Amino acid sequence: MTDTRNGEDNGKLLYCSFCGKSQHEVRKLIAGPSVFICDECVDLCNDIIREEVQEAQAESSAHKLPSPKEISGILDQYVIGQERAKKVLAVAVYNHYKRLNQRDKKNDDVELGKSNILLIGPTGSGKTLLAETLARLLNVPFTIADATTLTEAGYVGEDVENIIQKLLQKCDYDVEKAQMGIVYIDEIDKISRKSDNPSITRDVSGEGVQQALLKLIEGTVASVPPQGGRKHPQQEFLQVDTRNILFICGGAFSGLEKVIQNRSTRGGIGFNAEVRSKEEGKKVGESLREVEPDDLVKFGLIPEFVGRLPVLATLDELDEAALIQILTEPKNALTKQYAKLFEMEGVDLEFRTDALKSVARRALERKTGARGLRSILEGVLLDTMYEIPSQSDVSKVVIDESVIDGTSKPLLIYENSEPPAKAAPDA
């Protein structure tokens, strides 16, 4: 084959044999035996092949479901700790998609029910990351919804059916794909009703939303306007069956540990009562492991809603050692991400052990868990990331504890020179 650019073959104007455009209308025209193809048609063919390969891979991965151990092993690469939660999620997700793979088989007199999941754990403990990693592993559409923005139909705010619309957007409005997806509803504890007793007043963002979510989570046919349009009577809707969508709800449930402790430590009063010291109190994570459906009802979730979330997984608070692991070990660890950014500038980035410990301590003080690690590192590295692109002679940047504490600046090591003395502490 020859590449015919903007020259003519024997004074004759050449055309693409596929789209009919002349050589002057395209960037390149490739010549074959008695045929020509332009660069635009080549790009189009590549796109078609790429789409077909992706669809074939998606179909094969749907039939090749990883085992619970394999699922947990992949979660280990991204999420530190939380072994119990990983095991619960791996089994629940495996059973859910095994059920979907079997649903078309005839002469099966046993109908398997759907097991939606409730994740309970402190802020920054990895609830959202677990759900995201599961969806990526299984190659299914995934969306995150914030329960605090949801209201009952007819009130200002997001309708619960908007959740399904977001899921459709993730898969280009392919209804079949959406019906195999995963929905993560965050901050689910924020829609708890304010007291144990049903209120006579309308609670449009609490109990009312729980009622609206019931059918969606259990399984219904949701009517969603196509391509994200607004609803109006003359419009045709996309019908999405939610029976096979896996719903994972997550929340911090602050104060739930007190409900559990009150139930488990209920005792008598008087001289014969058992005396308990404050030191005997359990950690939040240990208390949450003992949660029962009645505790969630007392917290403010309605019994019907609790019943729709039969699989319960609790996550522990992250300690200093776990936060240091999160900074360094996962595939997407923050220190690896920042090292990659510096590497693009031809600079090595080194975090000393005392610096990592200091970052972890600051995150614990802020009570933000792993979520606060990035903001701490961003603040520490901001000035360095601003200056480095303008300095071509820097070969290495070293971060130690004093840099994290703000008492000194990062150590810059220059090419072909002795390492300079550390910068004096800021006045």
Curated annotation (Swiss-Prot):
<comment type="function">
    <text>ATP-dependent specificity component of the Clp protease. It directs the protease to specific substrates. Can perform chaperone functions in the absence of ClpP.</text>
</comment>
<keyword id="KW-0479">Metal-binding</keyword>
<dbReference type="InterPro" id="IPR004487">
    <property type="entry name" value="Clp_protease_ATP-bd_su_ClpX"/>
</dbReference>
<dbReference type="Pfam" id="PF06689">
    <property type="entry name" value="zf-C4_ClpX"/>
</dbReference>
<feature type="binding site">
    <location>
        <position position="41"/>
    </location>
    <ligand>
        <name>Zn(2+)</name>
    </ligand>
</feature>
<feature type="binding site">
    <location>
        <begin position="122"/>
        <end position="129"/>
    </location>
    <ligand>
        <name>ATP</name>
    </ligand>
</feature>
<dbReference type="GO" id="GO:0005524">
    <property type="term" value="F:ATP binding"/>
</dbReference>
<dbReference type="GO" id="GO:0051603">
    <property type="term" value="P:proteolysis involved in protein catabolic process"/>
</dbReference>
<keyword id="KW-0143">Chaperone</keyword>
<dbReference type="InterPro" id="IPR038366">
    <property type="entry name" value="Znf_CppX_C4_sf"/>
</dbReference>
<dbReference type="GO" id="GO:0051082">
    <property type="term" value="F:unfolded protein binding"/>
</dbReference>
<dbReference type="GO" id="GO:0009376">
    <property type="term" value="C:HslUV protease complex"/>
</dbReference>
<dbReference type="GO" id="GO:0016887">
    <property type="term" value="F:ATP hydrolysis activity"/>
</dbReference>
<dbReference type="GO" id="GO:0051301">
    <property type="term" value="P:cell division"/>
</dbReference>
<feature type="binding site">
    <location>
        <position position="19"/>
    </location>
    <ligand>
        <name>Zn(2+)</name>
    </ligand>
</feature>
<dbReference type="InterPro" id="IPR050052">
    <property type="entry name" value="ATP-dep_Clp_protease_ClpX"/>
</dbReference>
<feature type="binding site">
    <location>
        <position position="16"/>
    </location>
    <ligand>
        <name>Zn(2+)</name>
    </ligand>
</feature>
<dbReference type="Pfam" id="PF07724">
    <property type="entry name" value="AAA_2"/>
</dbReference>
<dbReference type="InterPro" id="IPR027417">
    <property type="entry name" value="P-loop_NTPase"/>
</dbReference>
<keyword id="KW-0862">Zinc</keyword>
<dbReference type="GO" id="GO:0140662">
    <property type="term" value="F:ATP-dependent protein folding chaperone"/>
</dbReference>
<dbReference type="InterPro" id="IPR003959">
    <property type="entry name" value="ATPase_AAA_core"/>
</dbReference>
<dbReference type="InterPro" id="IPR019489">
    <property type="entry name" value="Clp_ATPase_C"/>
</dbReference>
<dbReference type="InterPro" id="IPR003593">
    <property type="entry name" value="AAA+_ATPase"/>
</dbReference>
<feature type="binding site">
    <location>
        <position position="38"/>
    </location>
    <ligand>
        <name>Zn(2+)</name>
    </ligand>
</feature>
<dbReference type="InterPro" id="IPR010603">
    <property type="entry name" value="Znf_CppX_C4"/>
</dbReference>
<comment type="subunit">
    <text>Component of the ClpX-ClpP complex. Forms a hexameric ring that, in the presence of ATP, binds to fourteen ClpP subunits assembled into a disk-like structure with a central cavity, resembling the structure of eukaryotic proteasomes.</text>
</comment>
<protein>
    <recommendedName>
        <fullName>ATP-dependent Clp protease ATP-binding subunit ClpX</fullName>
    </recommendedName>
</protein>
<keyword id="KW-0547">Nucleotide-binding</keyword>
<dbReference type="GO" id="GO:0008270">
    <property type="term" value="F:zinc ion binding"/>
</dbReference>
<comment type="similarity">
    <text>Belongs to the ClpX chaperone family.</text>
</comment>
<feature type="domain" description="ClpX-type ZB">
    <location>
        <begin position="4"/>
        <end position="57"/>
    </location>
</feature>
<keyword id="KW-0067">ATP-binding</keyword>
<dbReference type="GO" id="GO:0046983">
    <property type="term" value="F:protein dimerization activity"/>
</dbReference>
<dbReference type="InterPro" id="IPR046425">
    <property type="entry name" value="ClpX_bact"/>
</dbReference>
<dbReference type="Pfam" id="PF10431">
    <property type="entry name" value="ClpB_D2-small"/>
</dbReference>
